[in-house]
Amino acid sequence: ARLRFGRLRTVEQFYTFFSRDGLKRFCETGTLDDFPEAFVKPFPPNMRRQLLTALADHIRTGDVTGRLLEPGVFPDYLSMTTSERSGVGFFTTEHFPLQDGFCSVQIREPNLCRAFHGWLTHLPATVHTLGAEETAAVLDELARGISDTQ
């Protein structure tokens, strides 16, 4: 997880979208839906608070375009990465209802990549997400609610 987060910090304009349910699961368990406990050790409570607070701060400054998705915009059981240059990747999380395990699909066709990338990068300006300040406030609130016994 640290390697992935480190790589994401090198992206010029980083977009991240998440669900309230996914954030709540992270706060409660310390695991990320796309990094299940079978592969990555859960984050301890103090690190969960630090990650959420840091993400909220980066969203407020505009270093990261992070938004909380409204329910139903994107399914919780899928994760997606996109880049105009490197393609689009979909992979299942442990919440995928039709299988036991993981699967992924990589798309390299340039027009499809541009279409998916364009869809994601336009989301922050739509009614499908909370605004930057609202999203940051939710992250701060969730961080404050993490107890050391979780």
Where are these regions (language model features)?
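Hydrophobic protein-protein interaction segments
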Residues: A1-L139, A143
